Amino acid sequence: MIIHVTYLSGYITGIISSIIISAILGLPLAPERPARHSWTPSAIFPAPIIAMGLVAICIKLGVTGMYGGVDLGVVSGLLAALMTAYFLEDIFPRPEDL
């Protein structure tokens, strides 16, 4: 099974914590319009997606946390929000035509 029910709370905690911390760091909640041509990082995308990926990587490596993945979700949400706010455009630069 890809997502085990035991770690579902870790995924949900990662999503919620990444959105809250991203909003605290000053990222907009939604990207600018039109959304399909926007390269603005926001609290809704890509921070929660990165947090879910970090939780999945940690669970696959055997790091499950102490509280059913909730603590792992909070840490991954924090790392995802910091990465989205400060390092995302260094890793993935803006396209030239936008």
UniProtKB/Swiss-Prot annotation:
InterPro entries: Prd_NiFe_hyd_3_EhaA (IPR011306). It is a multi-pass membrane protein. The keyword Transmembrane helix applies. Keywords: Cell membrane, Membrane, Transmembrane, Transmembrane helix. It is found in: Cell membrane. One of its GO terms (cellular component) is plasma membrane. Disulfide bonds: none annotated. The chain crosses the membrane at residues 7-27, 43-63, 72-92. One of the integral membrane subunits of multisubunit membrane-bound [NiFe]-hydrogenase eha. Eha is predicted to form large electron transfer complex and might catalyze energy-driven reduction of low-potential redox carriers (Potential). Belongs to the EhaA family. Putative multisubunit membrane-bound [NiFe]-hydrogenase eha is composed of at least 20 subunits. This is Probable [NiFe]-hydrogenase-type-3 Eha complex membrane subunit A. It comes from Methanothermobacter marburgensis (strain ATCC BAA-927 / DSM 2133 / JCM 14651 / NBRC 100331 / OCM 82 / Marburg).
